Amino acid sequence: MVIKKYIDDAVSLLRQIVAIPSCSFEEDEVAGFLCGYLEDAGLEVMRIGNNITSRLDFDASLPTLMLCAHIDTVKAADSYTFDPYNPPEAEDRILGLGSNDDGGSVVSMIATFLYFRDLKSAPVNLYLLLSCEEERSGKGGTTGLRETIAANADFAIVGEPTGMEANIAEKGLLVIDATAYGRSAHAARAEEGDNAIYTAIRDIETLRSFKFEKVSPLLGEVKLSVTGINAGTVHNVIPETCTFMVDIRPNECYTNEEIFNMLQACVKSTLKPRNLSNRSSATPAGHPLIRTAEALHIPTPTSATTSDWMRLPVPAIKMGPGDSHRSHKADEYILKSEISEGIEKYIEFISNISK
């Protein structure tokens, strides 16, 4: 069966969905468009909120592989040199917000799904999940679909821009909002107050120098970064509160609860986790997903970024077209050749998964 048609259709589809704004929690329009596209292609589709699912059952005795990619994007960076929703056309690439993260995986997985539908055969049953709210860990995305996923899939490929390498582990995500407290006073009488900014600075330095002793052979050290700070509204008042954000990328050696408790014990600021469930992930050793990647000589590195994988109740790998270094940056793009490679390698991987 000629694959070129599926590649051409995927490139065309990606241009169309890039033009539809779909920031996290604002995916209604793109979800409706993709539902219509899949239904027009002859698939039975179920929409759960702004998540889209479809099944291909070839043999009840076969396990089911889920193809999962997210349809939402981050907000466009201010430094775009073109309209992120109406980008210029280029001969070798598709430009625009979400083209690389995660539109390339979305359209490549759709093309792969349709390829096996038309082939009417595969060594596994297939389940397609196009998820929402991934970029902001929303409860309406895969977080709220654990039972649905567990009932429909035995294992999964999570589509993210990995250059079609099969990531077999990824760090988790723990975001903490911190508040340092002090006592307000006139700036001319600073000694009468207690500047919350200074407390925050001391705590930030404590966090910055904090050492996590356990190092994972797969995922390395826990990474911690302070990524935002805010205090004060006028020049002549000592601020009584100062807030800051902490981004932590855990390995599997610690639970998020353990990390949170360790950090709270060493700072004066009050810490509040946004979500404790975004755990690290690793494909079980010897799993068919790993064996298939190795048989096809696909590299199996680990990943520094997070994805829907951390919310899945089934074993998975992370693999998709594009380059993670382009994600969340201005002038985002994906190469047409990467879309082609993505579809071809997905088809090859699935065709060989039982071998």
Label each PLM-derived region with a short phrase:
Residues 17, 21, 38, 160, ...:
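Residue-level signal for inorganic ion chemistry
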Residues 2-97, 119:
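Acidic/His- and Gly-rich active-site-bordering loop/insert found
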Residues 65-67, 129, 155-157, 317-319:
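Hydrophobic/aromatic beta-strand patches that form the interior of the parallel beta-sheet core
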Residues 75, 92-108, 186, 319:
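Glycine/serine-rich anion-binding loops at beta->alpha junctions
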Residues 103-175:
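Acidic/histidine-rich catalytic neighborhood of metal-dependent amide-processing enzymes
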Residues 5, 161, 168, 175-355:
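Metal-dependent amide/peptide-bond hydrolase catalytic core
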Residues 34, 106-116, 142-145, 200-203, ...:
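Buried hydrophobic packing segments
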Residues 90-92, 112-127, 207-217, 329, ...:
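Phosphate-handling active-site elements
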